[in-house]
Design a protein with these regions (language model features):
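Residues that flank catalytic or metal-binding motifs in active/ligand-binding sites
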Residues: 53, 85, 113-116, 140, ...
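Extended, low-hydrophobicity, Ser/Thr/Pro/Gly-biased non-transmembrane segments
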Residues: 46, 112-113, 160-232
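N-terminal, polar/Ser/Thr-rich
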Residues: 19-69, 213-218, 225-229
Length: 232
């Protein structure tokens, strides 16, 4: 009996030692290895891809009213092998929106109505931002939903024109008015979220403490900021 117990204990220890020599790999990472988009060496795989977006933006900040108005076009290219049913646009100033979820308790002077989309056009066709079948806003994420027949195919691109505004709060999170003439404007434009080969869309709501994954997809920027006192 003692010999049987010793043999069993030895087998358990051997099995445990073998198990400890391998590491847990999340299923999403393993799928990326299998698809060839990532490699065990930490470098991109032979099938790696990144979606891209090009921004052409213009903004004007009125220091007296603390109102920022912006407009611009985003050209988004789907380099993934997936047909996209929707896009996500990050409205990061919504972290200060009244009634929104956030990691800090703010006074009224630190709250606003969020980033308000005044108009939107997709592929030169004006759309109603209030159409819930096409647009849905959750926290800092704005979903732009395509019909099943008009999904964004692999290799296709889409242009989105936006006009927006928001009230700059006092001493906000990476975004605020500090004096009558000193402003920190960190998240001033709508940004298309990252869609990657591991998790798909970055759907995480920005609540204040964390840095956001999307610093915009790979692409380019053409931007102009109008100085209000010269534009009067």
């Amino acid at each position: 009996m003692k010999r049987i117990i010793l043999i069993t204990a030895g087998l358990i220890m051997a099995t445990t030692g073998f198990a400890q020599s391998s590491y847990f790999v999340p299923k999403e990472i393993q799928a990326a290895y299998d698809n060839g988009t990532r490699s065990h060496k930490g470098v991109p795989g032979e099938n790696y891809w990144q979606n891209t977006v090009k921004y052409n933006l213009k903004a004007e900040l009125n220091p007296q009213t603390k109102m920022l108005n912006g407009s611009g076009t985003m050209v988004y290219t789907n380099n993934s092998p997936d047909s996209l049913r929707f896009l996500i646009i990050k409205l990061l100033p919504n972290v200060h929106k009244k009634g929104g979820a956030r990691d800090y308790a703010f006074g009224e002077e630190h709250l606003n109505d969020g980033m308000i989309i005044d108009s939107i056009a997709i592929s030169d066709v004006a759309e109603d931002i209030g159409n819930r079948r096409k647009f849905r806003e959750f926290g800092t994420n704005l979903y732009v939903i395509f019909s099943r027949a008009n999904k964004l195919a692999p290799g296709a691109d889409i242009d989105i024109f936006l006009q927006w505004h928001y009230q700059v709060v006092d001493h906000g999170l990476r975004n605020g008015a500090y004096t009558d003439s000193a402003f920190f404007i960190g998240y001033w434009y709508p940004q298309i979220a990252v869609y990657d080969d591991v998790f798909g869309w970055d759907r995480e709501d920005y609540t204040g403490k964390q840095e956001t994954y999307n610093k915009s997809e790979m692409g380019g920027f053409n931007r102009a900021v109008v100085e209000w006192w010269f534009a009067r």
